[in-house]
Amino acid sequence: MRSRGNTDGLIVKNITIKTSTYIFYRRVFTMARFTLPRDLYHGKGALEALKTFKGKKAMICVGGGSMKRFGFLDRAEQYLKEAGMEVQLFEGIEPDPSVETVMKGAKAMMEFEPDWIIAMGGGSPIDAAKAMWIKYEYPDITFEDMCKVFGIPALRNKAHFCAISSTSGTATEVTAFSIITDYEKGIKYPIADFEITPDVAIVDPDLAETMPQKLVAHTGMDAMTHAIEAYVSTANCDFTDPLALHAIKMIQNDLVDSYNGDMAKRDSMHNAQCLAGMAFSNALLGIVHSMAHKTGAAFADYGAHIIHGAANAMYLPKVIAFNAKDETAKKRYGDIADFMGLGGDSLDEKVALLIAYLRRMNDDLKIPHCIKNYGADSYPAEQGFVPEEVFLERLPEIAANAILDACTGSNPRQPSQEEMEKLLKCCYYDTEVDF
């Protein structure tokens, strides 16, 4: 099976990357690259594309049961059998999948030896299956090696990969990223490499219509964050900008109505989040995601996670205020405000209007504005589940880990340790970013 791209190494600032990709840290580039799945099947009924797959064995990786409950898992299994394949299921992938789940799934793959891996559901089962795929193809690779930015060896020696999304946010069905949680450390780690971009994506809105309201809100704001961060990223380009802007406009028009039960808008959001994913997979992200990755599981010992999409929604307005101190980023945020029709005469006014719009959207979606008011059920609460003294005690380590996150290098303004701690405090207390 063929591999994507060239794997010659280049050392820049002590970080090894591939010469077919851009450097992750600041505005130093080799040849840029734009990578998408080879095929993308979309529209109602697109799941039937599985009937056309060629292979001998397929392993379907799924999560907690919604795909089975609504009949989509049975249909996928039947379509693959109609294609002449033997099918095995790997079920029960948890939200925010763990390293242990990845290793367990990879072991099942090694025993079954599929030539197609079919990941089906939300971001968690697809992300987990991507990491399982790496371990399946390279049994001796460690999780630490998987997390080396753009350091994955060539895949597709044993299997191809198809991702079928059932939620409208992560867009992992079209991206070069996977997020895996090390619960011993309380840290979410991004795996980033074009090798794990799926070969085939199936974007069937029938699956997304099953999402509960809270999930619509969180995944929708995840998608909005993807699009905005991609547009202001230091790796943005002519190929990613139109995708990001169009996704932002679609989310502006569709998310709140989708949340309130409009199924036509729900279908449109499924496309919007996919466009946002195409943009950020190639333009990269910023410190909203760095902070979300490092706070998500940081307080799990207090009985809850800060759900990724909700974390992005809370942090995005604060990060815009921080990044807008950089003139280039301020201009890009102004472009977004103009494209959304928010008004404003000066760039400062446009940035303020964009921030205000996003905060209103959070209100409409019942997402709190800060960690202090983030309830264990993710809804606004007078007293959230993260105690102030615990947050402050863990703050230095969380800030340091956020700075080291793979998404930080493409942020338009690089924070110091002190600035990251101050920014996280603003996200805890919902205070003004004035630095």
Where do the model's predicted regions map?
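ATP/NTP phosphate-donor binding region
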Residues: 14-116, 371
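Carboxylate- and glycine-rich phosphate/diphosphate-binding segment that chelates Mg2+/Mn2+
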Residues: 177-283
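Short, amphipathic C-terminal "tail helix"
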Residues: 389-435
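Gly/Pro-rich interdomain helix-loop hinge
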Residues: 301, 305, 309-390, 433
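Glycine-rich phosphate/pyrophosphate-binding beta-alpha loops
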Residues: 169, 274-312, 405-409
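Flexible, glycine/charged-enriched surface loops at secondary-structure junctions
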Residues: 234-243, 257-268, 283-288, 306-309, ...
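Glycine/threonine-rich beta-strand-loop-alpha-helix active-site module
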Residues: 100-206
